[in-house]
Amino acid sequence: MAGAFALSRAVVWAAGAAAIAIAGLHENAESFDADGIARGPGAYWDSVWFLEIAREGYERAEDAAFFPLYPLLLKATGASVAGGVLVSLACFAGALWLLHRLVALDFGDDVAGLTVLLVAIFPAAVFFSAVYSESLFLLASVAALYGARTGGWALAGVAGGLATATRSAGLVLLVPLGLLWWRSTGRRLRDLAWLALVPAGLGVFCLYLELEGRDPLAPFRAQDAWGRAFAWPFGGVVDGARAAWEGARQIAAGEPRTWPVYDPAWVDLALFAVLLVTLAAVVGALRRLPLAWSLYAVAALALPLSFPADGQPLMSLPRFVSVLWPLHLWLALVVVERPAARRARAPAPSIAREIGRST
């Protein structure tokens, strides 16, 4: 775990610093408080929203899309990029450590170590060391599932509530947690009662908004301000395919590219490629993993894929996938169990063993 954490974060930070040194900071860098090589790689698009909420509270309707636990931690550490990065790094280290323990319960240290490594080197893992809530959500969600898997229902409920106070996706933890309770010995109602804390994280957020004189239902409406609307279950798959097809058409036709930061045609193609790989991993997870883990991945994917974004249906999909560790677990099993895959990634099992020994 320590090796995966240190190596992956060093690579992310070095790459970000090199990019800043070569290309310079974005024109809006001052609003991120990212004024140099040392702190710049920790600030991305949504970082400014988290920082402004930490400093000023929920002033705008669209702010409610960012749930309060991470901004509260930012505020406690000075509402700065440096403080936010430290929070994210600490949460990510804890998440990897706990994830190793969770996976090792069923699959052993080698698979657990490789799973941790794959989570750490996933392309969208850059957000785990940035001023984003991904690290905190990963820690809280893994803690909730670890608690349920080991019979610690108080931990499952409290951590699940913290996950829901971090991101709306915390609500889907009720799917694997409910299944684990159903399969537990005795099915005690007092254990089930702890799971009521999972939606309580959202309830507390709504109550806070009400007490502040703001719309208590803003968390349910905020996605409208970001161009997301319900299509139909997994409707984003079809919309993403259409966007990718249109992007391919534009590129093939040589239409002029006008966006200053990135090319949406290529981005739509890349996002659709991520979707195809993700869906393949979901199928593999359903066939190979415990049902609670695979259903968690399906339920968590259902949220962004059922609420596609206007103009770019699969927006942020890699970031959503980054916290879906069951998909990384499935890939780890493929690498460990199949000789051809093992030869293709020869160093990975030995690295996984070293990670396992250091945990």
Spans of model-derived segments:
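Membrane-lumen/periplasm interface segments of specific transmembrane helices
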Residues: V11-A29, P41-A43, L162, L174-V277, ...
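Short hydrophobic/aromatic helix or loop-helix immediately within or flanking a transmembrane segment
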Residues: P41-A79
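Loop-to-helix entry region of an early transmembrane alpha helix in multi-pass inner-membrane enzymes
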Residues: A64, P68, L72, G78-G94, ...
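Transmembrane-helix motifs of polytopic, lipid-linked glycan transferases
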Residues: A76, L86-D106, V277-A281
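Transmembrane and membrane-interface helices of multi-pass
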Residues: A93, D106, G113-A124, F128-A130, ...
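Specific aromatic-rich, kink-prone transmembrane helix
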Residues: L98-R101, L118-I121, L136-L155, L174-L177, ...
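Transmembrane-helix signature of polytopic, membrane-embedded enzymes
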Residues: L99-I121, L155, P290-L291, L295
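Short acidic/glycine- and proline-prone juxtamembrane loop motifs at membrane-interface regions
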Residues: A130-L136, L317
